[in-house]
Amino acid sequence: MHAVRRAIISALLLACAGLSGAAQARPQDTALRVVVPMLHPSAREHASYFPRLLQLALDKTMATDGPYEIVHYDRELTSPRQALEIKHGGVIDVMWDGTNRQREAELLPIRISLLQELNDYRVLLIRRSDAARFANIRNLEQLRMLKAGAGVNWPSTDVLRANGLPVVTSIGYEYLFPMLRVGRFDYMPRGVHEAWSELQQHANDGFDIEPNIFLHYRVPYYFFVSRTRPELAARIERGLKLAQKDGSFDALFNAIPAFQRGMAEIAAKKRRVFELKVP
């Protein structure tokens, strides 16, 4: 009888110890795990801005929503593949990219522009040998005589084509630069925050940035999550708004040299602005 009583007491003590351990482990066990796209080692200087901004948003909501963990997926995914994975509950939970109708129909956007107005202004990456050719372009009709290069699934590709600008596409971003070099197309519209770092990376390819033209069209850059994860979207949105309110969003944005360069280029107002309609 005493042996049975001792066994019962021992079992109760073990159960209590187990509950205590579970309580101590609970914050880690229930932490929100957010898988984001891999950042390629050769990614441009501003690429880390997006996961850092996501981290900032989740930090701002820890008091109300609990702990979290951001994990980078271990393989590189194209933007269309990222969207497909999120849509079907695959290997990543959040992506960041320019928006379009299809993406917003399939995924859930957090409608706070991550790049402010930077993604709305495009400069033209051209062959240096074509500088005089572009110097004579005064309007959109003249630009339509030349061919642009862009990614096959980029939101910008739809905008260019909708405005009558011929576009040669590539399935991979990295293939566009050799295509420009050998004359497959005449220019690459690049975000005003992207072009100068790309020019530096391809310093030996004979490229230049056309100095007189802006293409202007509004393609906000958003975080996207699955339509089955509205609670994640709501948390990110609340966190971003809190960061906007206390100034930490702008502080992170303004700490990126490429963003500073882009905003200065917009503010200078030295370029002709060709307005494009977004379909």
Regions found by a protein language model. Give the residues of each.
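Ligand-binding clefts/hinges and TM-proximal coupling segments of bilobed small-molecule sensing domains
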Residues: G151-A162, L240-P279
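Ligand-binding cleft/hinge of the Venus flytrap
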Residues: L54-E69, N136-Q142, V152-G172, L199-N204
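A ligand-binding cleft/hinge motif common to bilobed small-molecule-binding domains
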Residues: I86-K87, V94-E106, Y187-F214
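Extracytoplasmic small-molecule ligand-binding "clamshell" domains
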Residues: P27-E106, I236
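Short helices/loops that flank or line small-molecule/ion binding pockets
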Residues: H72-I92, A162, E174-H193, H202
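Periplasmic-binding protein-like
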Residues: M38-H40, L118-V123, D130, Q200-E237, ...
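A conserved helix-loop-strand patch within extracytoplasmic ligand-binding domains
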Residues: L114-D158
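Short loop->beta-strand "edge-of-pocket" segments that line small-molecule binding or catalytic clefts
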Residues: T30-A47, N136-N153, D186-Y187
